[in-house]
């Protein structure tokens, strides 16, 4: 078949597909309304936004946040909810653990009056609610906290001690098959918080695994591994918060396996000022001499905590430092952006 005949055959096939399945059911990626832009929601930690490579968590995708207990999973998810609301978006929180603290969420910056919350009885109800919210097209982010607490209905109705092999994994697999396409169409970000377990009898390699089977690993565009690596000491004998290290374990939108560190303070959540200060020092925007921090010809203060408090008060300086960090780190092109440029360079037939 020569080239003109191949084109005619393709055009006929496209016309039939559009007639059968509707306009826009198939299109050239570089033409029409096929968008290359990825809308994101900031995480609240600039270092993590940079590690993700796209400036935050993507809309229309599934994101998994997993880690040990008290590592900051819920705090990170709540910051994403707060940032989505600040952008004028709508957020929903499916609290399967029945453990959301409204006062802490409010302290972080979430608008609890406008936050939609659901505390379903079983896993099937939770996932159905998530799908219906996504299908509405009016919700920007849905947090499911957590996968481990999504109890299948048959397990809930049975007795303690009954064996239910692979029941939760099958439930997750079935739900995610339906949810993925709905999220993409509605541009809703679904954040699944997950716990870790240990495999029995593993002598070599990492014995840790996440609950809910393999489906969530496959369907997630981004997987964030979050860990507590130390305590932040106060002036007295008490701790101010935790030092957190995050690894991007999977990333379909930018290079994976990047890491980021930031502080989670007990009275305010993720310390944006501390995060910006660390990045400014790392990129030689702020000079650190001994315990003193200098910016251009100005002394910011002595000691990291004192400078962090000063930056919290001086919003103008904080924004200036953030702007300079973003200029210095002018992020490398994402996979999508590289593909867009490649398509633009191709000759038009």
Curated annotation (Swiss-Prot):
Provide the GO biological process annotations. DNA recombination; DNA repair; SOS response
Instruction: Could you list this entry's UniProt keywords, alphabetically sorted.
Output: ATP-binding, Cytoplasm, DNA damage, DNA recombination, DNA repair, DNA-binding, Nucleotide-binding, SOS response
GO cellular component entries:
cytosol
Q: Does the keyword Transmembrane apply?
A: no
Q: Where in the cell is it found?
A: Cytoplasm
The text of the family note is: Belongs to the RecA family.
CDD domains referenced in this protein's UniProt entry, alphabetically = RecA
The UniProt entry's coiled-coil ranges are: none
Annotated residues that bind ATP are located at: 67-74
Q: Which SUPFAM superfamilies match?
A: P-loop containing nucleoside triphosphate hydrolases, RecA protein, C-terminal domain
Q: What does this protein do?
A: Can catalyze the hydrolysis of ATP in the presence of single-stranded DNA, the ATP-dependent uptake of single-stranded DNA by duplex DNA, and the ATP-dependent hybridization of homologous single-stranded DNAs. It interacts with LexA causing its activation and leading to its autocatalytic cleavage.
Protein name, UniProt field: Protein RecA
For this UniProt entry, the molecular function terms from Gene Ontology, in alphabetical order, are: ATP binding; ATP hydrolysis activity; ATP-dependent DNA damage sensor activity; damaged DNA binding; single-stranded DNA binding
């Amino acid at each position: 078949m020569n080239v003109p005949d191949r084109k005619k055959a393709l055009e006929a096939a496209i016309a039939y597909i559009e007639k059968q399945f509707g306009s826009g059911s198939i299109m050239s990626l570089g033409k029409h309304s096929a968008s290359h832009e990825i809308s994101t929601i900031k995480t609240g930690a600039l270092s993590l936004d940079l590690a993700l490579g796209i400036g935050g968590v993507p809309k229309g995708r599934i994101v998994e946040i997993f880690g040990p207990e008290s590592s900051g999973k819920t705090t990170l998810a709540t910051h994403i909810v707060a940032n989505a609301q600040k952008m004028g978006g709508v957020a929903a929180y499916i609290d399967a653990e029945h453990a959301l603290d409204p006062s802490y969420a409010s302290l972080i910056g979430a608008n609890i009056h406008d936050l939609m919350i659901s505390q379903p009885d079983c896993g099937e109800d939770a996932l159905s609610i998530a799908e219906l919210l996504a299908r509405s097209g009016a919700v920007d982010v849905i947090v499911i906290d957590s996968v481990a607490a999504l109890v299948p209905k048959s397990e809930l109705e049975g007795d303690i001690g009954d064996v239910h092999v692979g029941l939760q994994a099958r439930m997750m697999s079935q739900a995610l098959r339906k949810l993925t396409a709905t999220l993409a169409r509605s541009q809703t970000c679904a954040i699944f918080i997950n716990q870790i377990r240990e495999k029995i009898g593993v002598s070599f390699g990492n014995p840790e695994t996440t609950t809910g089977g393999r489906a969530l690993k496959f369907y997630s565009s981004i997987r964030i591994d979050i860990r507590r690596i130390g305590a932040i000491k106060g002036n007295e004998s008490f701790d101010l918060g935790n030092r957190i290290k995050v690894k991007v374990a999977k990333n379909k939108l930018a290079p994976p396996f990047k890491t980021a560190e930031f502080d989670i303070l007990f009275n305010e959540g993720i310390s944006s000022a501390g995060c910006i200060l660390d990045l400014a020092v790392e990129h030689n925007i702020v000079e650190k001499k001994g315990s003193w921090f200098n910016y251009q010809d100005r002394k910011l203060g002595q000691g990291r905590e004192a400078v962090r408090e000063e930056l919290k008060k001086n919003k103008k300086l904080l924004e200036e430092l953030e702007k300079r960090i973003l200029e210095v780190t002018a992020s490398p092109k994402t996979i999508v952006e590289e593909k867009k440029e490649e398509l633009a360079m191709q000759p038009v037939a």
